């Protein structure tokens, strides 16, 4: 079994391309089902954030898995596959596993060490698990990636003094206005996590008036209440736009929230007063043409790079330590993955032993005549103990040999000596195989 990945991120594609391939939370289940139906796909997870869209596929052949990934991404994008391919990267098993671990640890983020991505990795896995598109290999891989991400944050200072995208947006506004945010009016569009963080950072920086607008007015009211702001209905957005000096927008909408003509009317209503628009949504919330208007400065998520350089050197030192953790956790996963071929033989051996045990217990109980329930349980327990003890050493030694040349010899010997009928499909999600240090996957 192999794991492959394909996708694009902030390093390979600008936001104008990334937004073409972004998946909203509610769109993930049907997308996962479509991907699972691709030829050669045994399991799949889709990770879609503001900085990346990646698909991870468990497959029996790497070439088939990568082909399925590219076909799916091509059909899911508004661009032709030929145009999209220049922005895509494809990763085979070794690179895909290490890449996912680095993503979970925040090492592949635009903001080195940022912590939001770990929650996004966990959510992507949860959605795929609930949709039923994961398998044993992906379950183990994702759980190990999340564990690795937590280890990195616990054992290093990778997230010390780091900044979030929301914080970077506020810092950009502070720089543009030369640290003079006092008395400014800021309109925040959206009431999700990033918008909430932005609103709180704004208050911390001295902004006196924060307007909050959201598709759900109740959520806008709730956020406004926590920061002493004012809630604005989304359909009344244009009425309040002329009051704003800064607009920060981050919604999950699949279409523009602010169009050029709306911004033009707001600017006309306040001649000579500049308007700063910061769009940190993917897909973008603000029509790019709005940035061409006189007096308007429009920034998108890709423009935040200059802000995230703060405190980078300290986090780079932590990143080097984190790479060691990633290497160790990835190697543990590769060992587990490399041992999977022995599992069908172990299952077949246990099943044959269990069948023999059950038959002999029934025969013994019939010969002994009337037995109490307690006596039957004692006989069954004794037979189970004998079987487990007889098989224990063989199974332990087979697992230990799985990563050596002897492993295949042991498998063939057991299958021939015990005349096992082996199902070569992989074990189910609950089958655990321990291969090192007592860690169980």
Curated annotation (Swiss-Prot):
Organism, as annotated: Moorella thermoacetica (strain ATCC 39073 / JCM 9320)
SUPFAM superfamilies named among the record's database cross-references: Glutamyl tRNA-reductase catalytic, N-terminal domain, Glutamyl tRNA-reductase dimerization domain, NAD(P)-binding Rossmann-fold domains
Annotated site location: Important for activity: 99
Listed InterPro entries: 4pyrrol_synth_GluRdtase (IPR000343), 4pyrrol_synth_GluRdtase_dimer (IPR015896), 4pyrrol_synth_GluRdtase_N (IPR015895), GluRdtase_dimer_dom_sf (IPR036453), GluRdtase_N_sf (IPR036343), NAD(P)-bd_dom_sf (IPR036291), Shikm_DH/Glu-tRNA_Rdtase (IPR006151)
GO terms of biological process kind: protoporphyrinogen IX biosynthetic process from glutamate
Binding partners and assembly: Homodimer.
Binding site for NADP(+): 190-195
Coiled-coil residues: none
Entry remark concerning the domains of this protein: Possesses an unusual extended V-shaped dimeric structure with each monomer consisting of three distinct domains arranged along a curved 'spinal' alpha-helix. The N-terminal catalytic domain specifically recognizes the glutamate moiety of the substrate. The second domain is the NADPH-binding domain, and the third C-terminal domain is responsible for dimerization.
E.C. number(s) listed in UniProt: 1.2.1.70
Binding residues for substrate: 49-52, 109, 114-116, 120
Record's protein name: Glutamyl-tRNA reductase
EC primary class: oxidoreductase
UniProt entry tagged with the keyword Ribosomal protein: no
Reaction catalysis annotation: (S)-4-amino-5-oxopentanoate + tRNA(Glu) + NADP(+) = L-glutamyl-tRNA(Glu) + NADPH + H(+)
Keyword field: NADP, Oxidoreductase, Porphyrin biosynthesis
Function recorded in the entry: Catalyzes the NADPH-dependent reduction of glutamyl-tRNA(Glu) to glutamate 1-semialdehyde (GSA).
Source species, domain of life: Bacteria
Residue numbers annotated as active site: 50
Pathway participation: Porphyrin-containing compound metabolism; protoporphyrin-IX biosynthesis; 5-aminolevulinate from L-glutamyl-tRNA(Glu): step 1/2
Homology family: Belongs to the glutamyl-tRNA reductase family.
UniProt xrefs under PANTHER family: GLUTAMYL-TRNA REDUCTASE
